[in-house]
Structure formats: structure tokens, C-alpha cells
Amino acid sequence: MRLWLRGLVYQARRSSWGVFRIHTQPPPPPIPEVVATWEAISLGKRPVPEYFNFAHDVLDVWSQLEKTGHRPPNPAFWWVNGSGTEVKWTFEELGKQSRKAANILEGACGLKPGDRLMLVLPRLPEWWLTIVACMRTGVVMIPGISQLTQKDLKYRLQAARVKSIITSDALAPHVDAISADCPSLQSRLLVSDTSRPGWINFRELLRVASPEHNCLRTRSGDSMAIYFTSGTTGTPKMVEHSQCSYGLGFVASGRRLMALTESDIFWNTTDTGWVKAAWTLFSAWANGACVFVHELPQVDAQTILNTLCRFPITTICCVPTLFRLLVQEDLTRYKFQCLRHCLAGGEALNSDVRDKWKNQTGLEIHEGYGQSETVLICGNFRGSTIKSGSMGKASPPYDVQIVDEEGNVLPPGKEGNIAIRIKPTRPFCLFNCYLDNPEKTAASEQGDFYITGDRAHMDEDGYFWFVGRNDDVINSSSYRIGPVEVESALAEHPAVLESAVVSSPDPIRGEVVKAFIVLSPAYVSHDPEALTRELQEHVKTVTAPYKYPRKVAFISELPKTVSGKILRSKLRNQEWGR
């Protein structure tokens, strides 16, 4: 494996080195060997390699090329905060630090291949180090957003039988409070400049850990990552990905959608707990690009725009919600010296936002669409015609179709389920399964297809046009929110007799959580405004704050089927004027 990737990187280095030195558009770089190999795998001309490890077969090769002067002097990782502190690592330094982190996981934490480590950290350099350390050791990483509540943490630690967790001072007390209920949890890593009883201080050990470590030889199909994803019923599901699905699957998105080369500096503003953070890591580093990170304790438009002016960022990826905030500023006041490519994903982007951004910056916004279960499904690739409002065309190796409820392919113009063909050959860059949930895994397949759960139609030119979810999941500012999670939180308040939670349109967030609530008799006469605020604050204390209902309506009864099931679809259609 290392031989063909070595060839890929030597070829990739011949691309546009002078991106900061020339002002004309450089010629398209040659397709590197990794993309050629990936395409051969997707076409069945070359089998998926038996062994693959992204840290060993990609990152360490770039490190060797740096030593021989065959890569531009860009950092591989560049972190900044609002106080002027910066951290820069070359691929060689990234390798050294991640090997030290790997020794901590194996030594102080006692983790073995296949053990599971939960990562709940804000945008700190240690998050990226630990991700690479997991690859080197065969430890399965489980990223989580930093807004998780004590209840959320407990469920995830128990469901995934997590052996160790790495987090910061903010969440450590929550972990302490529930650790007795999580028997699988054997060690706790703290990223902090201070110590805490019962915790292993990651930074202290990193300073003295050995930089020598032998990377585990992992099989392509070995488990590499687990992501919790919200659904319409019950608790979040565990999506398992392999070394190959992410390690090789994101190479193409890095080239085709993000247009990255080893001269680029790529900034994705997403939270570390979301799958898009992994998109950045694999897409950028597979193509030798630099991953840029701003700590962003609070996301605001001015910080984003000033950062784009101050640093030589060439490519940025934001959720549409953030672009909606950015275009409300006077963008002509900001001069982006190096920015040349803009990306959006996580939800549909409004055409007016794209137009405003282009009119003031001269830059297109290229949308990409994917899921926790997949890599890039379709996108508006660089160099292709953008149809405003479309998600673009299918991304190989996926054969993407629009199908009906029986799995039959529909003609252009017909609305149906977005589906990926999995027979006769399942794409290597699709998730393995929903862990411990064979029923959910089976239900996601219909005939020859994996059903995404999203609806769209495809036009005559092969462009996909998003319609919406065919279930009740709410996508607010790219946060996926299951209605049952919010309804369960509301049910813990004595004022709530029953509730139904649906999406409601919002000009900034795209959609927000709206709760229709039937009050208990004792609360019917309460002041509705005060009760709304009380219920909103209650939800924030029970589950992650981003899930709270921004809109609340008190009604006498909920619409239901004859069997008593709540008709969320009727309420949702009412909100959206359907």
C-alpha cells in the first residue's frame, strides 16, 4: 500500500506550487495516483487493498516528502485563537506528536486495537492529534460535539461501551458524575493545563512521551470511527465507518469538490463533533493540503471575515447558516487576498445567499451533499456548471438514483428517495452498519439500493434538487435533531401533557425546532410567554442546548392516526404551507 501512495504523492507535488506567487489561474494539476487508484477500485478494475492505514500510508509519506524538499513549505496543520496564539505543524511534526499521543493511548490508557475512545473537545490541536493517534493504534474514535449534556454523554458511553474518553475542563465534571454508571469506562484523559483527580493529564504526558511508535497494520475493513446520528424514533444510532471508507473515500471530494492541492490552506469552520470535521481532515491531508483551524469559542461573522483577510486561506467551507450571516455584512470592506474556492454543506443553500456572496466577492459557493453514513454523494464540482439551488451531480464511485418506495428507479423530474446502488457491489466508501441495530441497517436498504432518507428529483442533465427529509429529522443550522429527543425532554416537565416536535422555516437557520404542546390541566391558565421561556430553559438543561424549541405553540390536542400515532407530518406541512 505504501508503494502506490508514495507514487501518488510524488505525482501530486507537481501540481500548482505557485498558488501564492502567481495571479493567473494555474493549469489543472495532473490526477494523482491515489485518485487513479480510487477510480480503479470504484470501477471494479482494482480491488480494495487488504490493508490500509491513513496515518502510515498517507501522512507518513507526506512527511518523507517534506524531508526531501518535495512539498511546498506550507504547514500541514495551522491553529489560531483570538488571542494571537498559533500552532503550526509540518507533516513531520504532526507525525512526531501523533506518535507520542499514540503511546499515551496504549500506555497510560491501556487501549488496544478495537477499543473505543470518545473525543469531546472544542477546536483544540489535541483533537487532531488524538484522531491520528487512534489511526496509528487501531483504536476506534467516537467524536462528539462539545455541547453534549450529562445525559447525552451517559447514553453514548454506555451504548458504545467506551473504554476511554478525552475531553476538556468544561465537560470533565459531567463525566465524573456519570462514570459509576459506565462500567466499560476505564480511563479519562484531560486536555488542560491543570490536574484533576482521577484523570490523566494529556498535555503533561505529551511533553515527555516517546516519539517512537510502530503504526498498527490495519485492514481496510477494520472499524475506524463511530458517529452518533439522530433519527426520528428513539435514541441516536451508531454509524460505523472503516479505515477504507473514510481514509480512501474522501480523496475524491478533496480533488473534485474542494479542488485541493499541497499548496492550499483549507478552513472548515465546523465543530469537531460533526462528521464534516472528518471530511476536512481526510480530504485535505490526502491531497497534501494544510488544515487551518480557528478556535472560534463563539462563531460570529466579523471573526470569520477578518480571519479570511489576515491569513492566506485559499479554501473555506461553512454551513449555509454561516453564509447567511456573512452576506448580511458589507463584504466590500474585506479583502480576501488568497481565497479562491468556497464550499457549503450540511443543509440546502438559498439561491439569494449564493448570489449575494458572488456579487460582493466574485466567488461561487460550491455545495456538497453527504451523510454520516456516506462520503460525498453529489456536489457542484469545480469547473462544472452550477445550477443555482441544485446539489450538483453524483460523485463517483456512487451510482446515485431517485427511486420510489419499492426501489424502482424513477425518470428525470420525478420526486423520490435519494438512493445509492449497493448491488451487485457495495461501494467501499459506505458505512459498515448501524452498530447493534440490525433492524435499522436492514431498513435502510430497499432492493438494490441504500436509501438515504432524503427526497429529491434529478433533472435531464443529472443534477439533483433537494426536496427534504422523508422522515421527521430536523436540520437546523446543520444540526440534526431527532424530534423524540426534544419531546422526551419536554415530557420531563410537569406542564407538558404531550407534545409533537417538527421543523419550522427560519430565514437564518433554514429551519428550527417548533414544539406543539398540550398542557397539563394545572398549567392551562399560566402565562404563555413565561411558560414558553420556562420550557425552553428546561430543555436546555435536559439535552444539548441547540435542540431547544425556538418556537412553541400551545394547542388543545395533537393530530393523530386512528391507532393513536402523532401525525407530525400534518404539523410539519402546516408550518411549511404545504
Curated annotation (Swiss-Prot):
Per UniProt, the transit peptide runs over: 1-22
Q: Which cofactor does it need?
A: Mg(2+); Mn(2+)
Instruction: Provide the GO MF annotations for this entry.
Output: ATP binding; fatty acid ligase activity; fatty-acyl-CoA synthase activity; GTP binding; medium-chain fatty acid-CoA ligase activity; metal ion binding
- What residues bear N6-acetyllysine in this entry? K96, K151, K335
Catalytic activity, EC: 6.2.1.2
Q: What class of enzyme is it?
A: ligase
- Biological processes, Gene Ontology terms: acyl-CoA metabolic process; fatty acid biosynthetic process
Concerning PROSITE patterns, the annotation shows: AMP_BINDING
Compartments in which it is found = Mitochondrion matrix
Sorted UniProt keywords: Acetylation, ATP-binding, Fatty acid metabolism, GTP-binding, Ligase, Lipid metabolism, Magnesium, Metal-binding, Mitochondrion, Nucleotide-binding, Transit peptide
State the protein's name: Acyl-coenzyme A synthetase ACSM5, mitochondrial
| Gene that this polypeptide is encoded by | Acsm5
